[in-house]
Amino acid sequence: MSYGTAAGVAALAPRYANAAGRFDENTTPKLAHVTDWLAQVSAMLDVALSGYGVETPVTVAAILPMLAGYANAQVAAMVRGVNGQGRFAEKPTTADEMLLIIGDATAAWVTKNIGGLGALLDVTPVTLATPTVTIGSFTRRDGYSSDGSEYTA
């Protein structure tokens, strides 16, 4: 299930849609690309949400407009980007590079909003595991050995 629609993307990036306000085979990008990108961004949302214990795809009416708006906005940014405009225009960026950037942004967006999303979905978000690095110290046991046995952990 995709969040957002090609019509929603066209509403945010009307310059790149046809005269009827739709993407088709003659627009850049084509409708098929917009549809694929919506599915990919939606999958990114689902993966990020499921990492917090949220059942996906989300079907709760109170949340769907927010997820659709996010997907539409990210795909509209891609539409502008492939046309050399918008936030991806600063340096040449390919569609696959844009998707990687959007993937990172999606994870951050879900992390920022998971408290409210979890409350509306009646889910207690799980805490993601954070790796812990422990740095030890060494104490010299004697001043004369040289085979490495002079240190204890």
Summary of predicted features, one role per range:
Residues 1-66, 121-153:
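Conserved short "hinge" loops at termini or chain/domain junctions
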Residues 36-122:
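Internal mixed-charge
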